UniProtKB/Swiss-Prot annotation:
Tissue localization of expression: Detected in eye lens (at protein level).
Intramembrane stretches: 2-12
Organism in which the protein naturally occurs: Rattus norvegicus
Record protein name field: Gap junction alpha-8 protein
Superkingdom field: Eukaryota
Alphabetized SMART domains for the sequence: CNX, Connexin_CCC
Disease connection: Defects in Gja8 are the cause of cataract.
């Protein structure tokens, strides 16, 4: 049958570039087809034409009947089947080898570029990226174990070669059925020219040949089943990868873009950052001012959250306008109130002074001369004495206490209390001196 070593060496290369099911298919091809076909089938079909005997003496009738019974030898048919079924695998191996060589050239080119970069940097070590490190590892592993992944055009070529193998298997099984059927009969009747009549021909080893035919057909069906299984395996794998990509790609993007997003977000916050509604700060609302808040109850009685806002909850830019205004201090408010209250007090004091002057003139006894006293000074008579002084001092105290009570802020209740302390000696002496000056 010839030497199968050449085809075997090529198919070994296919084993290195196939899936698990593809390797099983190659095992079936080598052991159950090539090995059995090269060892046992030749001995069974070795005497095929010589042992084909017909009951006629007509020259050429036996050869014509054999050609009609066996248009092609089973062994040659199976050899053609092996060749045709292996051809797509050979095409795939050629493409895989080309792909591997191109990858090796690309990796060598990248390694040269890295060397040139390191030389251009003055001998400094350039930090190796993870992709480049993986490329180096994969290149070393590909040289050692020749492992790779089915992706891209290589995967398409692999799927196409499985489809063609399946088609060839089905075609040869159907052709075998139409040519021979699934069994060999011991008696074959032939009526072909130049036979004078119907001739009976006898086949040697019909049972053994039938067993071999059934065995080879079963191996063909097993190979067909493995092809279908491999197609379904690749299909399920593609579906799983398609379902996993939407879940895995966002994670990969987040992992790659996390550092970039952090840097960009920090720059944007530095330029301008607006607080969200839930991030509003309310600790700067003061209950004593009437700009932003109005106190509904004492500060110690209720928490700060119970203050009601006068201004609607709008953007913080509107709220900040109220706090930019300058608020009047306690001193300014007190000064304004004093200015308002001084005018009616002065008007009330002037008529009181005039009445006191008239009373002093009436009370003065006859024979004494009245002296004109300038405004603002007290007039005392010798007849009145110390009682009038006490009454005037008490009136002055009352007026002073009223003014102080009106001018003092409401927040200090201690200042509004009456002062019942006695007058000092100096104040009494000054009042006596004034009364002595007024008397004549």
């Amino acid at each position: 049958m010839g030497d199968w070593s050449f085809l075997g060496n090529i198919l070994e290369e296919v084993n290195e570039h196939s899936t698990v099911i593809g390797r099983v298919w190659l095992t079936v091809l080598f052991i159950f087809r090539i090995l059995i076909l090269g060892t046992a089938a030749e001995f069974v079909w070795g005497d095929e034409q010589s042992d084909f005997v017909c009951n006629t003496q007509q020259p050429g009738c036996e050869n014509v009947c054999y050609d009609e019974a066996f248009p092609i030898s089973h062994i040659r048919l199976w050899v053609l089947q092996i060749i045709f079924v292996s051809t797509p695998s050979l095409m795939y191996v050629g493409h895989a080898v080309h792909h591997v060589r191109m990858e090796e050239k690309r990796k060598d080119r990248e390694a040269e570029e890295l060397c040139q970069q390191s030389r251009s940097n003055g001998g400094e070590r350039v930090p190796i990226a993870p992709d480049q490190a993986s490329i180096r590892k994969s290149s070393s592993s590909s040289k050692g174990t020749k492992k790779f992944r089915l992706e891209g055009t290589l995967l398409r070529t692999y799927v196409c070669h499985i489809i063609f193998k399946t088609l060839f298997e089905v075609g040869f099984i159907v052709g075998h059925y139409f040519l021979y059927g699934f069994r060999i009969l011991p008696l074959y009747r032939c009526s072909r020219w130049p036979c004078p009549n119907v001739v009976d021909c006898f086949v040697s080893r019909p049972t053994e040949k039938t067993i071999f035919i059934l065995f080879m057909l079963s191996v063909a069906f097993v190979s067909l089943f493995l092809n279908i299984m491999e197609m379904s395996h690749l299909g399920m794998k593609g579906i799983r990868s398609a379902f996993k990509r939407p879940a895995e790609q966002p994670l990969g993007e987040i992992a790659e873009k996390s550092l970039h997003s952090i840097a960009v977000s920090s720059i944007q916050k530095a330029k301008g950052y607006q607080l969200l509604e839930e991030e509003k700060i309310v600790s700067h609302y003061f209950p004593l001012t009437e700009v932003g808040m109005v106190e509904t109850s004492p500060l110690s009685a209720k928490p700060f959250s119970q203050f009601e806002e006068k201004i609607g909850t709008g953007p913080l830019a509107d709220m900040s306008r109220g706090y930019q205004e300058t608020l009047p201090s306690y001193a300014q408010v007190g000064a304004q109130e004093v200015e308002r209250e001084e005018q009616p007090v002065e008007e009330a004091v002037e008529p009181e002074v005039g009445e006191k002057k008239q009373e002093a003139e009436k009370v003065a006894p006859e024979g004494q001369e009245t002296v004109a006293v300038p405004d603002g000074e007290k007039v005392e008579t010798p007849g009145v004495g110390k009682d009038d002084e006490k009454e005037e001092l008490q009136a002055e105290k009352v007026t002073k206490q009223g003014l102080s009570a009106e001018k003092a802020p409401t927040l200090c209740p201690e200042l509004t209390t009456d002062d019942n302390r006695p007058l000092s000696r100096l104040s009494k002496a000054s009042s006596r001196a004034r009364s002595d000056d007024l008397t004549i």
